[in-house]
Amino acid sequence: MDPLTAIAASGMRSRTETLDLLANNIANAGTSGYKADSESYDLYFGSDAWDGFHQNRPMGAEMPLVQRNWTNFSQGTLMDTGHMGDVALSSEGFFVVQTESGPLYTRTGHFRIGKSGRLETEDGYAVRAVGGKPIQLDPAKPFTISTSGQVSQDNAPVGNLEVLSVDTVDNLTKRGGTYFMLSPGAKTSPAKDTEVLQGKVEASNVEPTQAAVKLVGVLRQFETLQKAVRIASEMGKEAVEQVAKVG
């Protein structure tokens, strides 16, 4: 593969990954608690690129590549719903839910009372109380949640929502749309100065207009790279034809 085609093909692959990411962000612009993803590029320092340099291969064949995706954890707008099962956090921290594979962390506070009487997410995951146990409620009765996270029924406390902060958000990996898994060995602590707000939800932090503008720009870049590949292919054919004529 000639250097021009290699560079363009690498760029097209990176743009394809970016397009997928942007499309997913736009699709989740209306998903409560969703955190937008972005990408960072490894342009020059990948091991493959350096190997190519030392072996006199075109480094462009390995560049640019999407090195990793990262998540924007900035807070979304808090929106009033008035619904008993909707809960938002005023500041940092995450709700903790229990799954078969272990705890997950989320900013999405769409909760309900399940058939077994436990407080759970819309996906059926148990919402954990401080200490890690599920919160059991009477499905026939309403419940309240104080700003400190205390869940009560009939004016009697039944548990406190577990709201934790992590030492660094780099230790969180997205698992599904609005859930995150904590890296082994990462540290957590009770979220400080964070209020639990019943009857509110946190909107997605995706900026749809900004994402759409960026998507159009990436599409144009992709089309330009496609054109470069086509031109390189035509140049290659012409070169072969000229050699054949000389021969």
Describe the residue ranges of each PLM region.
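Amphipathic alpha-helical polymerization modules
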Residues: 1-247
